[in-house]
Structure formats: structure tokens, C-alpha cells
Amino acid sequence: VLAMPVESDAELREILGLETIAVVGCSATPGKDAHEIPKYLKEHGYEVIPINPFADEIFGREPYDSLADVEEAVDIVDVFRPSDEVAGIVDDALERDDVKVIWTQLGIADDEAAERAEADGRQVVQDKCMKVEHQRLVG
């Protein structure tokens, strides 16, 4: 089943109704978007799984080194890495059966990788901030 790009608020609302978010590039540094946005999501009831090979602890837990290492079931992969790393992250996501949505934060996009994910039946949201969309659609 070919998934189409996510464009409607109804689709975004449905995605924001999912529970578990693996955050690739999650930061241990307060003040950085890659820390503050996942923190906001955690505070709003999501299970946030930090992925960062260089940090010892984020949000009171040890982060995974990569998406491939995550033992929990993942609904959404939220990407806080440069656009040129998106393709590899999408490859990792497509190796997993559990990932329903790949979401790249503001300023991050790779259309070719997005098309591959959609061809595999995954939903893709590019170049949007999950916190902004949550505030706008869920409150």
C-alpha cells in the first residue's frame, strides 16, 4: 500500500494520537530544540525514547545508540539530524515493522527517502515541528 504525503490536519491529528516516539538525535543539552521538544512531548504523555550515541543519560534514562537498538515498539521516529542523514535513518526505520510514521523536524527533509518510506506503506511528515503541531491541533 502506497502511503501519500501527510498534508491534512486530520492525518496529523491521527499521528499525534500515537504513543511512542523514538527521537533520533535527541539532545542532553537543555535549551536545544532537540532537548526541549522531546521534553515537551514527554510532558504531554508520550513515551519518548531518546537515541543519541554520545549521551549517557537523557530524561533519566540511558539513550540507545541507534534506532536498530531500540527494544520497545516504536510508533513514530522523530528526526533531529541534518537532512543528509535522513536517508540512513529511514533505512533503519524500514528495517522495523513497528514504525508507522517518520517525522522530520523543521528544516529537515529528504524527498527521495520520504518516497521510499511511503512506498513501504509508512506515513511521512517532513519539515514540521512536532511541538508546534501538537500545540496547534491537540493543545
Give each language-model segment a name.
Residues V1-G17:
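Short N-terminal or domain-adjacent regulatory/targeting segments
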Residues S27-K32, P38-F59:
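NAD(P)-binding Rossmann-fold cofactor-contacting core
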Residues L67-G107:
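Mid-chain, well-packed structural core segment of small domains
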Residues L106-H134, V138:
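Rossmann-fold NAD(P)-binding glycine/threonine-rich loop
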Residues A22-V23:
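Conserved beta-strand elements of the Class I
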Residues Y46, D97-K100, D120-R122:
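A short helix->loop->beta-strand "cap" motif at the edges of active sites that frequently abuts
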Residues L2-E7, I58-Y64:
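Short gly/ser/thr-rich secondary-structure transition/capping motifs
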